[in-house]
Amino acid sequence: MRVALILLPFVVVLLGAAEKPSVIVVTGAPGTEEYGQDFAKWADQWKAASKKAKATFRQVGKAKKGDPKDDLRKILAKESKKSPQPLWVVLLGHGTYAGKQAKFNLNGPDLEAGELAEWLKDFERPLVIVNCASSSSPFLNALRAKGRVVITATRSGVERNYCRLGGFLATAIGDSTADLDKDGQTSLLEAWLIAARRTAAFYEEEGRLATEHSLLDDNGDGKGTQSDWFRGLQVTKKSAEEGLLPDGLRAHQFHLIPSANERKLTAEQRAERDALELELARHRSRKTKLKDEEYYERLEEILREMSRIYFPDNQGNSNIE
């Protein structure tokens, strides 16, 4: 009994640690000292944001020796596959594309899109994959899956020049001024929209031809959507596939640094809320196909289910302000 009591605090600590979000930042082969400084700075910004988020942060590729690809494989192998907490994988560096093969350049063997897809295939937890490298577009289709958010710095494999999206995104992800809907937290969608627009502005102000056009995919079709297809937080172009929600909805549910109110929800409550928000979006998209009575009846049901998350005692009392 005494042993159990002594061990209990350690068990609680371990369980708490397992419930943290995870952020894995991979810095690639820089090529030049200047690029190396950029990638290191961006990684430090992700580290600072992760600290604010109270997330577990790990960086791969910082050491000049070793095999960073194998290090990443081992880290992912140890990650929980079904945690309710999100896993963020961020690639900062250069990429290459030859034929049909896209790679992320590392000090040592390069990382192929198919390899990363294989390592992540059994993950059922919330998952964000951001490839800020040149020629990164093929990673989008290779890594697409239901419930995932995949971002690439380019819209094609032939956009081979150094990409600046990574720097703007590293800044925006921890920037409260990127909170476009003013809900007290910056979502991945908001950070990406700001970063993509700042990237485009850079080329325009410098009088250069833009050599990178970022894509975001979170509906699993692997096609991706550009930032200029959005008006505010809404996509202006609908998917050609019947019943498929537009990109952006899932990305808007990911917040690396959650607000005070968001932190009051458990991971399970957030997962339930997120599922209901997506169901609400699907239902609204079917409005013209339903009778008014049927539409509003189901709409009320969804909203009631959402309200129970914030007001579980049904008495109007909640920790959410």
Each predicted region: which residue ranges?
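Loop/turn elements at helix/coil->beta-strand transitions in domains of secreted/extracellular proteins
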Residues: 19-23, 53-56, 82-87, 123-128, ...
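A short, glycine/acidic-enriched catalytic loop
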Residues: 94-123
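Sec-dependent N-terminal signal peptides
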Residues: 3-13
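Active-site-proximal beta-strand/loop segments in catalytic clefts of secreted hydrolases
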Residues: 26-30, 60-63, 90-94, 107-108, ...
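Cell-envelope and extracellular/periplasmic
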Residues: 18-34, 172-179
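Active-site-proximal C-terminal subdomain of hydrolase catalytic domains
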Residues: 44, 128-227
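Disordered regulatory segments flanking catalytic cores
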Residues: 9, 16-24, 36, 208-321
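Functional beta-strand-loop-alpha-helix junction segments that form "active/interaction loops"
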Residues: 34, 45-85
